[in-house]
Design a protein with these regions (language model features):
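Short, flexible loop/turn elements at secondary-structure junctions
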Residues: 30, 94, 348-352, 362-365, ...
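Primarily recognizes the serine-hydrolase "nucleophile elbow" in alpha/beta-hydrolase
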Residues: 69, 73-149, 450-523
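Beta-sheet entry/capping signal
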Residues: 20-24, 87-89, 111-113, 153-156, ...
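Alpha-helix capping and helix-loop boundary segments enriched in small/acidic/polar residues
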Residues: 3-7, 42-47, 58-69, 91, ...
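Accessory cap/linker subdomain of secreted extracellular hydrolases
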Residues: 33-74, 177-181, 190, 264-269, ...
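Cap/lid segment of the alpha/beta-hydrolase catalytic domain
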Residues: 1-79, 93, 120-129, 367-454, ...
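Alpha/beta-hydrolase-fold catalytic nucleophile elbow
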Residues: 27, 91, 116-117, 158, ...
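Alpha/beta-hydrolase-fold serine-hydrolase catalytic core, especially in secreted/extracellular enzymes
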Residues: 4, 18-22, 54-63, 108, ...
Length: 610
């Protein structure tokens, strides 16, 4: 509102100053492009707001929240330094309008709020820039509901042209007047004379930003009338103004980042208190001991308590659709055959418009009425089921086929993380209703398990999971929830997940990649990989880790795994958990993991290995 080049009527700060208002204009985190010399981060193509959004979202914080706190700090200053009878007003345009609306909803000290270039229906909030993504927003708090929280204080909404924003993992454009008016009419307040107004042009087109009608209505709430004169301002008379403004913007980002990173560093203790030490408080402060051995504890209490955490993880972290599974209606076709096995593509109905598919590999040496164990072999990002069977890649090493040659029935399901941003938009839409990409995947696997258990040659009590990369990510999310999986193997993914997603000082962090769907709301304060794996107990669990796998670092993998082994050991079940490090990269090694499958699925290894 003071910038050079703006028409006088759009210089809202100057106009307010001319009316005698004391002004405080908080600096907020910019939507300018993030400047960095790191080549990988450059490829991620982030704005400064997205940079904060990504790391903060995973820690239960939000870039919107940080900016609202700055605004409330300004309100604090006015409340402390002005007479108690003085009214406090707030105006905001575009991103500032979003912040003004939310700040006014939170702080009753704000008497009058004017927003412009923001208000609209929240139905398509998923299509707006990624830094506006708010968990469960569409379920309970659309713009109308937030606006209702401002009542009975004054809220003035001006339908002006929105800022044009494209390419921010979402776009902004001026909505149709019908959409704005419909959302305005949804604002509920128990009194009919609620002090809210919507300003549009007489032809219902967007009005000029800070129109005379809107400005006058704002002044009237302070018992003021528009003055005849104007106040002319230079944008900044200081010679170093441009540098100061740039530093102020950088400081806003730096302050938010420093706070988020402090949460990342301390999050391990928060998670311990949330889960392990809440269930087993006596483990938090164990006395010093020189005993050669300690007593084994009974697991029943932990298993019972973990059931509630399993529900929380499924419904609050991953998200669950409140829908019943459809009849599977399986459709199959033969797609490959060797001397040792036959492969079939399978399609299963899950929900309306959602299906599951994969490739079933059946050994040829099965006896009549024999029921064999199954290994579900999961591909990674941008993969397809056949990658695990006969595409001869060095990552998968045809492990589903090799396991079939060892006598296991194998099934390679297709997971939805294919097509890069196509699946990310699916996750983004799901976030608006408290769900994620895994809400779809869990339902697909649930149906798959149900169907596999009906096959006459399958032992439904011996269905294992083994996944690489994003498939390894699946290994610590789906089997912990779906207890029909009797064991799980995580390959090429097990990590200290909070640092993997939200840290800005780790070279393996998603903060340096294009994978903007990886933050999960507040997961850093609830479930890291140790906590997810606790939900597997007492079922067997294994990690496969290549020393040269860039997905993480050995020390962080070992750090997180040590917590898992500790849990199993306290209950005398350390033989059910294992980790194998090998001199390789992001790949299926198929050595210790194959032994693990033979052992815990009670299936004999080939004669040459016995």
């Amino acid at each position: 509102g003071l910038a050079a080049g703006l028409p006088p009527e759009q210089q809202i700060a100057a106009r307010l100053a001319a009316q005698g208002f004391d002004l405080l204009i908080p600096a907020i985190i910019s939507r300018d492009k993030l400047e960095t010399e790191d080549a990988r981060t450059q490829q991620a193509d982030m704005t400064q707001r997205e940079w904060i959004y990504r790391q903060a979202f995973h820690m239960g914080r939000h870039v919107i929240g940080y900016d609202v706190q700055r605004i409330l700090g300004a309100v604090d200053w006015f409340a402390q330094n002005k007479p108690a009878t003085a009214k406090i007003g707030m105006v905001g345009y575009g991103e500032g309008g979003l912040l003004a609306l939310h700040a006014a909803a939170i702080d009753p000290r704000i008497d009058v709020t004017l927003i412009s270039g923001y208000f609209n229906s929240s139905e398509a909030i998923w299509s707006e820039p990624i830094y506006r993504n708010v968990w469960r927003r569409s379920l309970s708090l659309g713009n109308a509901e937030v606006a209702a929280l401002v009542m009975p204080r004054t809220l003035l909404i001006e339908h002006s042209e929105f800022p044009l924003v494209t390419g921010h993992k979402g776009d902004l454009s001026t909505p149709a007047k019908e959409s704005v008016r419909a959302e305005f009419e949804r604002i509920r307040y128990e009194q009919n004379d609620a002090p809210r107004q919507l300003f549009v042009e007489k032809n219902d087109e967007p009005t000029t930003r800070w129109s005379d009608e809107t400005f006058t209505a704002f002044l009237n709430r302070f018992d003021l009338k528009p003055s005849e004169g104007t106040v002319a301002f230079d944008s900044d008379r200081r010679a170093d103004a441009v540098a100061r403004i740039a530093e102020r913007k950088a400081r806003c980002v730096r302050q938010a980042e420093e706070h988020v990173q402090s949460l990342v560093q301390q999050s391990e203790h928060v998670r311990d208190k949330f889960f392990l030490y809440n269930v087993k408080p006596e483990w938090q402060e164990r006395p010093w001991s020189t005993d050669k051995s300690h007593a084994i504890e009974k697991p029943e209490t932990f298993i019972a308590a973990a059931a509630d955490y399993r529900r929380k993880f499924a419904t609050e972290a991953m998200g669950r659709f409140d829908l019943s599974l459809a009849s599977p209606n399986a459709r199959t076709r033969k797609v490959a055959e060797t001397e040792l096995w036959t492969a079939y593509d399978v399609v299963l109905d899950v929900h309306d418009s959602l299906f599951a598919w994969g490739t079933l590999v059946i050994p040829k040496n099965m006896k009549p009425e024999e029921r064999r164990p199954v290994v579900v072999c999961q591909h990674g990002r941008n993969g397809v089921p056949r990658d695990t069977i006969d595409n001869h890649t060095t990552a998968y090493n045809d492990f589903a086929a090799k396991l079939a040659e060892r006598g296991f029935v194998t099934y390679a399901p297709h997971n939805l993380y294919r097509g890069e941003d196509q699946y990310r938009w699916l996750d983004r839409k799901a976030n608006a209703i408290g769900c994620t990409l895994f809400s779809f995947i869990i339902a697909q696997h649930d149906q798959t398990l149900t169907w596999l258990s009906t096959l006459p040659f399958v032992d439904g009590d011996r269905i294992a999971f083994y996944g690489l990369s994003y498939g390894g990510e699946t290994a610590v999310r789906v089997p912990p929830i779906l207890e029909k999986y009797c064991l799980s193997i995580c390959s090429g993914d097990f990590n200290q997940w909070t640092r993997k997603v939200a840290s800005t000082d780790q070279p393996f962090s998603f903060m340096r990649t294009i994978e903007w769907e990886m933050p999960y709301w507040n997961l850093g304060h609830s479930f890291d990989y140790a906590e997810m794996t606790y939900l597997m107990f007492p079922r067997p669990f294994m990690v496969e880790r290549g020393h040269h796998d860039g997905v993480g670092r050995d020390q962080w993998v070992a750090h997180e795994f040590a917590k898992v082994r500790y849990l199993y050991a306290q209950f005398g079940m350390s033989d059910r958990v294992d980790i194998e490090f090998f001199q390789g990269g992001h790949s299926i090694n198929g050595q210790g993991t194959f032994d693990f499958l033979h052992k815990h699925l009670n299936w004999p290894a080939p004669d040459s290995e016995q």
